[in-house]
């Protein structure tokens, strides 16, 4: 409970920094889960550079992009009624999610040294499955998020749920 209060104080004092660092930390945690529980690499075979890449992506891409998107979405559709939440979720999942995944997957590929041709082939192979899997999880989460959660907590709530999603994304993005 004290940790949560400290997080709230830090979030109130430095909202953008805390949101970005939260995204980076939880992206890293998702990669650790992917490597250790899904891929069963063990500590000796753990790819620390890959985890650092995911932390960097969380801080430099996911946190700023998703956090910025929530601000834009809240300005575009102000309000917290059920109808407002539904509109936000539909825009988020119909517009933002496909674009986000279409940027995230090749960004990871580029950071992993894939050639443009290999990256394009990987995107064509992985994108449809990643988007379909996205739709199994995120519409319900986002509907609740937009209806129940204040704007300054949305990225943190999503990133907590996203630990599992990040594990999947890390596995998908690093699978050759």
From Swiss-Prot:
A molecular function GO annotation: channel activity
Coiled coil: none
Family matches, as Pfam families: Mpv17_PMP22 (PF04117)
Transmembrane residue ranges: 18-38, 53-73, 94-114, 131-151
Membrane topology type: Multi-pass membrane protein
InterPro entries: Mpv17_PMP22
GO annotations of cellular component type: cytoplasm; cytosol; mitochondrial inner membrane; mitochondrion; peroxisomal membrane; peroxisome
Tissues/organs with expression: Ubiquitous. Expressed in pancreas, kidney, muscle, liver, lung, placenta, brain and heart.
Mutagenesis / variant outcome for changing residue 93 to P: In MTDPS6; results in altered ribonucleotide incorporation in mtDNA from patient fibroblasts
A single BP term in Gene Ontology: regulation of reactive oxygen species metabolic process
Known role: Non-selective channel that modulates the membrane potential under normal conditions and oxidative stress, and is involved in mitochondrial homeostasis. Involved in mitochondrial deoxynucleoside triphosphates (dNTP) pool homeostasis and mitochondrial DNA (mtDNA) maintenance. May be involved in the regulation of reactive oxygen species metabolism and the control of oxidative phosphorylation.
Disease (UniProt): Mitochondrial DNA depletion syndrome 6: A disease due to mitochondrial dysfunction. It is characterized by infantile onset of progressive liver failure, often leading to death in the first year of life, peripheral neuropathy, corneal scarring, acral ulceration and osteomyelitis leading to autoamputation, cerebral leukoencephalopathy, failure to thrive, and recurrent metabolic acidosis with intercurrent infections.
Family statement drawn from the similarity comment of this UniProt entry: Belongs to the peroxisomal membrane protein PXMP2/4 family.
Protein name: Mitochondrial inner membrane protein Mpv17
Organism: Homo sapiens
């Amino acid at each position: 409970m004290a940790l949560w209060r400290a997080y709230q104080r830090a979030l109130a004092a430095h909202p953008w920094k805390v949101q970005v660092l939260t995204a980076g930390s939880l992206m890293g945690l998702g990669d650790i889960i992917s490597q250790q529980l899904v891929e069963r690499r063990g500590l000796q075979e753990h790819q620390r550079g890959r985890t650092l890449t995911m932390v960097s992506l969380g801080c430099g891409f996911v946190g700023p992009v998703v956090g910025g998107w929530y601000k834009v979405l809240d300005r575009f559709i102000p309000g917290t009624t059920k109808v407002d939440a539904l509109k936000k979720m539909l825009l988020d999942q119909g517009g933002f999610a496909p674009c986000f995944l279409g940027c995230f997957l090749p960004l990871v590929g580029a950071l992993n040294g894939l050639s443009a041709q290999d990256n394009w082939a990987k995107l064509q192979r992985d994108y449809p499955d990643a988007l379909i899997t996205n739709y199994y999880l995120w519409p319900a989460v986002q509907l609740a998020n937009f209806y129940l959660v204040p704007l300054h907590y949305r990225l943190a709530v999503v990133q907590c749920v996203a630990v599992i999603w990040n594990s999947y994304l890390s596995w998908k993005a690093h699978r050759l």
